[in-house]
């Protein structure tokens, strides 16, 4: 058993009678409606809240806080966290606090703590691989935890190699040898691993140029992110999107200023048309999917509803 449950690794281990000292750390970020910079700006200071501004597609993301939470399943975004991001963003980019906030959201870092500390920022972000046969006299179980997105492949390799060693096999992990898809979604063999580049615009100007050149103005589904009906259908057919959230990841549906208030209804109709033809969805299921999608969008909007944001 390989326990790779992230911030939930401690709970999984506890079900096997093993104690792992996890310290889940909540990180809150905000997105503003304008991509004011085209490069990451990071303040050179001791680790603290709000020290990085990242351009992401058509928006800019300011982050992040680091607050310990007792349960990674239940936490709230506090108003002071949003205010802190605005204040720190102003130091990086004058005028940042006057920009329109689109939403706030948070993730939970899977921090592993062996030593005592009151500050989660003092806990290392390096990944940890635990062999519970040696550590806890529980054979047949490994835990891979902590780490960051940039180290996930290395973590997978370390866990797979130890698992093979435990099972007395000489097979080695190949993740460091496998090719990642190129920016256009192709591997060197020409096989697509993601939607074609027409749906992979990072600037609204790129999408606008594509729409104008293809005379697709009358087919706009998401007016904020300039996603057309063709983009939505391509995500469903080529990208094999099964939910509205799948479509969001492909074409940024509902990620603009309206946060899905208009485009989601249109996209739900298109998704229903395509899935009904293959007997995969009923009207009731699409309505539930629509409700769930808008509920998730609303969660991110609520923390930034004050002042001019109303």
Which ranges hold each PLM region?
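Short hydrophobic core segments
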Residues: 1-8, 155
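Intrinsic disorder/low-complexity detector
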Residues: 5, 186, 195, 280-283
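C-terminal catalytic lobe of FAD-dependent flavoproteins
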Residues: 11-14, 19-28, 32-61, 67-259, ...
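A contiguous, mid-protein "functional segment" used to position or interact
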Residues: 261-292
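Low-complexity, small/polar and acidic-rich linker and loop segments
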Residues: 281-310
């Amino acid at each position: 058993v390989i326990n790779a449950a992230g911030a939930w690794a401690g709970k999984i281990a506890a079900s096997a009678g093993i104690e792992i000292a996890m310290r889940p750390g909540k990180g809150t970020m905000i997105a503003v409606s304008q991509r004011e910079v085209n490069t990451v700006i990071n303040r050179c200071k001791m680790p603290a809240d709000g020290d990085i501004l990242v351009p992401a597609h058509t928006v800019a993301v300011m982050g992040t806080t680091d607050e310990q939470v007792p349960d990674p399943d239940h936490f709230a975004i506090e108003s002071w966290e949003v205010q802190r991001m605005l204040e720190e963003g102003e130091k990086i980019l004058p005028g940042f606090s006057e920009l329109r906030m689109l939403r706030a959201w948070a993730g939970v870092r899977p921090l592993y703590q062996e030593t005592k500390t009151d500050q989660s920022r003092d806990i290392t972000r390096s990944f940890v691989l635990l062999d519970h046969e040696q550590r806890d006299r529980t054979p047949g179980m490994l835990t891979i935890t902590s780490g960051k997105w940039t180290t996930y492949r290395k973590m997978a390799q370390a866990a797979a190699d130890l698992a093979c060693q435990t099972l007395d096999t000489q097979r080695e992990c190949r993740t460091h040898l496998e090719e990642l898809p190129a920016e256009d979604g192709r591997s060197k063999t020409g096989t697509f691993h993601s939607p074609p580049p027409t749906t992979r615009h990072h600037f609204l100007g790129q999408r606008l140029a594509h729409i104008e050149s293809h005379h697709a103005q009358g087919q706009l589904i998401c007016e904020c992110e300039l996603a057309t009906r063709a983009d939505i259908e391509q995500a469903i057919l080529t990208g094999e999107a099964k939910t509205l959230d799948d479509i969001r990841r492909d074409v940024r549906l509902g990620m603009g200023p309206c946060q899905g208030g208009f485009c989601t209804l249109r996209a739900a109709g298109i998704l229903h048309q395509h899935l009904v033809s293959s007997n995969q969805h009923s009207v009731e299921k699409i309505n539930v999917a629509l409700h769930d999608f808008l509920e998730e969008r609303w969660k991110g909007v609520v923390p930034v509803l004050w002042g001019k944001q109303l």
